[in-house]
Amino acid sequence: MQSTGWFHWGRTILRAAGLFAFIAFAGSTFAAGPTVSNVRSGQRPGTQLVDIDYDLADPDSATLTVSVVVSNDGGATYTVPATTFAGAVGGGVTPGRGKRITWNAGLDWPNKFSVNVRFRVTASDDLVPLAPGGMALIPAGSFQMGDSFNDTPEGWGERPVHTVFVSAFYMDKYEVTKALWDEVKGWSGGNGYGFGNPGLGKAANHPVHSMNWYDVVKWCNARSQKEGRVPAYYTDAALTQVYKTGEVAAYVKWDAGYRLPTEAEWEKAARGGASGHRFPWSDADTITHSRANYNSNSGYPYDVSATRGYHPTFNDGVYPYTSPVGHFAPNGYGLYDMAGNVWEWCWDWRGEYSSGSQTDPRGPGSGSYRVYRGGSWDYGAFGCRTAYRYDGYPSYGNIFLGFRSVLPPGQ
C-alpha cells in the first residue's frame, strides 16, 4: 500500500535567508496502508537547506519506505532534480509524528527561484518478504529517469529527465543463463509451450541469447508454472488463457509471476540506489574493462579503459564474446552485468518520455519496437550507460541480446 502527502510553497525560495509561507495538504489515506499527513516545510535561515516535516502512520508495518519529489510549477510536474535528502527518508522509516527530511536545495538546485514549489511525500510498506534465491529486492522509491549528463542529442529519446516512482519488486541478480533457460524450456515442452528459437549460449554459465521477445515472455510463464506460481502473461484481456505459443502482444497480470521488467524498473534497478551517475556504479562516471564486458574505444571521454576493443579476457576468437554471469562486481542492489555482456529485453514498446512525474509507468499501449537495455559485449561505452535506450522488432533476436526476469512481492 502507498500514501502521498503534499506541501506547497507560496513564495520565492532559495535566497540564502529567504522566508516563505506555505499551505499543507493532507495526503491520500488507505484503511490498510500507510498515511502521510500534516506535511509542512521551512527553509533554514541563512542557508539553502529545507526541512520537510510530516506525520506518518501505518496500522500493520514496523517500517516504511518514504520518497520525496519536488515540483516548481505548482504540482503540474515533479521534475526538480532533487536527490540530496537526509533524515526520515528512504527505507526503514518507522511511523510517528514530526518526521523530518532535510533537502540540500542549494546543492541540487543552486541559484533557482520559484513561487510555486510543491513537495510530494510518499510512503509505502516495507512488508516485502526476503528475495527468492537468485534474486535481489529492488525497494520502492523515486528516481530521476533519463540522461542527466546530456550525453545524447535532443530527439534520441533519453530526455527529458523526469521523476519516476517504482514500487518494490525482485529482479534476477544475473542475466538468465543458458543452463536455466534449458532447464525451464525442457520442462515446457511437455506442458503445451512452443518456442520459435531454441536459445543459444556459449557455455552453461553464460547468458542465453538469440531468443526473440515473444519467446522470452513465454519462457517467463513456463518458469512461473514450473515453480507453481501464477503466470503473468495471457492472450486475452480477461487473463484466462495463459500465453504459451505463437507471437502475440500479451496481456499482463502485473501482480503474478515472472515477467520482463518495465523500462522504468530496469533503469531504477540498474542505478543501484544511487542517483546522478552515468553507469550502474556510483564511485565513478567512467567505464573500463575492469567494470564490464563491452567493446572499448577512445571515442567517448568517459571510456577510460587501458585496453581497447573487445574485452581481452573473453575475446577468444569464437563468437559471441560473452562472459560468465557475475564475473564483474555487482551494483548497489546486488545485480550483476547491468552494463555490457548482453542487451536485456524489457516489456515496453518504444515511446517518448514525458516531462511529468510518473508512478510505475509501463510504456505505450502499442508500437513497432520493444525496448532493450544495458549494452553488450559488442557495443561501445555509449550503450552501457544506464539511461541508454535501444529497441528492435519483438520477433528479432541475435547473439547480442538476452534478458533477466522480475517478480512482484508476494510471489
Regions found by a protein language model. Give the residues of each.
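Extracellular acidic, Ser/Thr/Pro-rich low-complexity tracts
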Residues: 55-60, 72
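Bacterial N-terminal signal peptides
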Residues: 15-26
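Structural beta-strand segments of beta-rich domains
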Residues: 48-52
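A short glycine-rich, aromatic-capped structural motif
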Residues: 60, 127-192, 209-225, 264, ...
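Short glycine/proline/serine/threonine-rich loop/turn segments at secondary-structure transition edges
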Residues: 109-116
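Short, structured beta-strand segments at or near domain termini in extracellular proteins/domains
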Residues: 121-123, 398-411
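Short, compositionally biased P/S/T/A/G/V-rich stretches that sit at domain boundaries
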Residues: 31-45
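Functional-site microenvironments in short loops/helix caps that host divalent-cation chemistry
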Residues: 138, 144, 149, 213-390, ...
